[in-house]
Amino acid sequence: VLVALSAGFWWRARTGRAKLVRSGEIVDLGKLKATRAGQPVTSFGKKATLLQFSTEVCSICVQTAKYFKELESKNPDLTHIEVDLTDRMDLAAHFNVMQTPTTLILDRTGKVQARIGGAPKINVIQQELEKLEIK
């Protein structure tokens, strides 16, 4: 019981926190096949992009997307892209997505700067966006 309890506390402490990504990977929008209003997404945000990986059965993903869309509406330099991984195991494997939502924070060139597994904490998102000059 103690082992399970400890594992639960460890998992909860890690969820929603940003991890610095040093891979230098630049996300290929063509491979994501993300759309907005039926049109392909062809550009990143002027300063930052929140790339959210979701699935059909993820209730937290809906809340996360709503929060990110609200942030996007308040800041013209920020773009939110949501990709449903339900039928995209290729992307889940490529980006090593083990839970949804998983959010990648990209700079203006699409380079991955940080990664958040699980429901993102608001203060963590704000801190990461400030690093990319988003207030």
Please describe what each predicted stretch is.
Residues V1-L32:
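N-terminal targeting signals for export/organelle localization
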Residues L32-P40, K46:
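Anionic-ligand binding region
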Residues S43-E56:
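Short active-site neighborhood of thiol/selenol oxidoreductases, capturing the structured segment around
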Residues T55-K66:
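Conserved redox-active cysteine motifs that mediate thiol-disulfide chemistry
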Residues F68, E72-N75:
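Conserved hydrophobic residues forming the short capping helix/wall of the S-adenosyl-L-methionine
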Residues P76-D90:
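Thiol-based oxidoreductase modules, predominantly thioredoxin-like and allied folds used
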Residues N96-L104:
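Structural micro-motif
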Residues L106-K135:
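Non-catalytic, surface beta->alpha helical segment in thiol-disulfide oxidoreductase systems
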